[in-house]
Every structure is written in C-alpha cells, then in structure tokens.
Amino acid sequence: MKKTILISVMLLFVAALGFNLANASTDQPHVYINPGHGGHSSDDRNVPIYPYAQGDTMGFWESNSNMYKCFALREILWKKGYKVTVSRETNTEDDDLALSTIVRLCNNSGADVFYSIHSNATGQGEGARVNFPMGFFRGYTDQPENPQCKVLTEKLAPFIIGNECTVWSSPNYQVWGDWNFQPSWGTQGYGVLRGNKTNAMLDEGSFHDYYPETYRLINKDYCWVEGFNFSRGADSFFGISGKLTTGVVMGNVRDDRRPREGILVMYGADKRQPVNGALVKLIDGEGTVVQTYTTDNNFNGIFVFKYVNPGTYNVEISNPEYETKTVQIEVKADDATYMNVDMKRVRNTPPAVVSYSPVWKEGDAPVKCNEPLVFQFNWDMDVDATEAALTITPKEEGTVKWEDTNYRMIFTPTDAYDVNTEYTVTLKKSTKHGGGVEMPEDFTFKFKTADR
C-alpha cells in the first residue's frame, strides 16, 4: 500500500511538472513559429506614419515586424540548439497561408511548442490608444483546453513585459484564454489555436497603433530583441539554461527636455523627442570600441548591441547637437540590459526673441483687443522661467500655450484688453532657454488697442 501511494505521488508530481519537465531532458526541443498576417494585403495591418504614405511597404506593416521578430527568434533558437520551423519565409500573399493550413502544418511538423507572433491595435480613435502586451491560449482563462498552453504563455510574459525601452500604459502582461477574451465567438477561439495539438499560444507583443511604438516597430533591431525575449520564454518553458553565452544591450536615446509633438496620446518618456542620428559606442574595460550603432531617422531613438560578451562596459552616446554622455552598464549571458538615455542639447548662445507680434509703433493702426502675444525664440525655452518673466502693464490675466517644441510662446488674454490703451510687454532677462542660460537684457515692446 505504501509503495502504491509513493508511486502515485511521484506520478502526480511528474504530471504537475508536465511538458516542461518531460522536454527539459530532450536533445532538441522543436519550436514552430508563425509570424502573423502577411502579404501587405487586406488582412495585414498598415499604420501610416510620417514620412511613409498609406500602403508604403517601407513603413509600418504588422507583417513586417512580425517577420523581423520571427527570424530573430529562429536565429537565436538555432544558436541554442533548438529545431525550428516557420510558417512562411517571405512576405507575399502567396505564403500568407490560411489559419487552418498553418495549424495542420504545425501538427504535422512534430513541434513541441507553437508561437504565433503578433502586435495589437485598439481599433479605436487616437484618444483611446494604449500600449501593453497580451498572451492567449485556447480555452477559458481559468480552464485552458491544454494547461501547458497557459504555462507556455506565463513563461513568456516576464520577458516581454520586461522590455524597458518601450513605455507601457499598464505594468502587466495580460494572460487570457481566447474563449474569455472573445466571448461572442463561443468556443471557436482564435484560428491558429483551434485544433492546434502542440503547446500553443498567440502573443500580442505591444500595440502597434500607439504611435511611439509604431516608430519603434519599424526598427528591425528593436524587433530582434523581442525575438530574443521569446527565446528566453522558450528556455524557461523547457527548463533550459546556459545555451547562450552572450547578452544583449538595447537603449532608447531621447532629448532630456524637448517635447514630442504631433501625437495625441503619449505616456511617460515617450512625451519627449527621440534623438535621430546618435552615434552609440560600446566600449570594453580596455577602452576598445567593440560595437557601434547609429540611431536611425525614424524617430525611435533605438540602439541595439547583439551577442555581447558578459562584463562591464561603457556606452558612449554622441550627436553634434548634444553633449556627449557616457553610461556604465553590466552585461550578463543570455540576458537583456536595457538603458534609457536622456541627452542634454548643446545651446551655445543665450536665448533671444527672434520675432514677436503684435508689432506696433506710434502712428500705426491700433491692435485688436483680443490679439494674442506671440514670441518666437532662437532656442527651446525653459517654460516655467519664461512664463514667470512675462509682465504686461496694465496687468492682464491670460493663458500661455507653447508650440514648436517650446520655441514659440503664445499669450492669450482671458478678457479683452482695455480699449484705447497703450500696453507695455516685458520679458525680463530672467528668461531662460532649456540649457539654463538667461537673456542678456530685458526684452520690451509696446502696442496700443483700438477704440472698440
């Protein structure tokens, strides 16, 4: 009896470990990768962003970024000794297979794990944009059809949400059964999960219609790091470690002050401008530059160093418009080191008003009583210091708005100015630009209002 109980307990223990333990000892786990959508066609996802026109295949298409992630994951899994199959090798309509065909091919491949790689979209107006990752498996969230599919999803989650070079609107990776997430579909669920006999999940790695993320997703190396993180999720699921002896570094270079404009919804550091054309050097302890990277011109600020030997490094970031910055980092094997770098702009002259309105002199026609005051500066300005330095005599209350990345200040009176009155407007020399330098002297002008 005791022997029977002991065997039963051992069987329960092995069952609890499930597929994870069973495959931890296999020589070559097999991963099947499906980069979602394809072909730049009607079932693909195109988000037009400057400077790319609607339909431009060089701009953002979900199929492009899904394939970048897929090929990165395959490359890294191969290095780790996995067997890998992918559902398509090119991005054409011809190999944009039906979902049922993908499932059949996966089932026939003998794969242990199936990853369907995607990014998400709100499908709503820009004011509703969000950014967080989600993972789906077949069944109900608390009752998966195959429990190991939920385990697979949960094993991936910390590596995707751990990306510190995006900005998440929510701090959690959402794990869902597809029947719960799409209740109106009943038990149909997602097509690539329906009938899939492997340990299968579908990942929505971020929201591609959150515009700062859209710009990041057209950077192949940014997508490469997501592929790397998928490989870590696979290792965690199979109980594998130590197969990759190098690490990865990814960073995001932004201006430390200048606001990003033209996008309605932004979170956290995404509200500041990314720096295009920053030269980034990875320098080892001997002072040798081991890798370099130049941030692209697609307004994402991303740089990536791949297959970096473990150790301590200095990362030097330079751009002619910014002060050079050096940051020390530590790289670990089969791990990602993230860094967000804020660059201080070189402002080598004092602030000055280069134009203003209304421009008025004695004998000119009077100014309308609701005319805003507009100041155009030679530098991006310290908003608080500049607003505090503004005086209007006689005193007028109003609101201040900034445009042109803080190069332009607009004062609009709350009520109309007094009629037939001469006003004196002064910006005191305590006015500062973003580098903290004050104006050499006060700036003053006058205007006179109309009779009515």
Placement of each model-derived feature along the sequence:
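Active-site histidine-acidic residue metal-binding/catalytic motifs
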Residues: 25-105, 109
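Active-site-adjacent mobile loop/cap segments within catalytic or ligand-binding domains
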Residues: 29-34, 41-43, 116-126, 136-137, ...
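A short, amphipathic beta-strand motif
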Residues: 247-255, 266, 341
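Extracellular beta-sheet/turn segments enriched in Thr/Pro/Gly and aliphatic residues
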Residues: 325-349
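Acidic, low-complexity Ser/Thr/Gly/Pro-rich repeat segments typical of extracellular/periplasmic
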Residues: 347-452
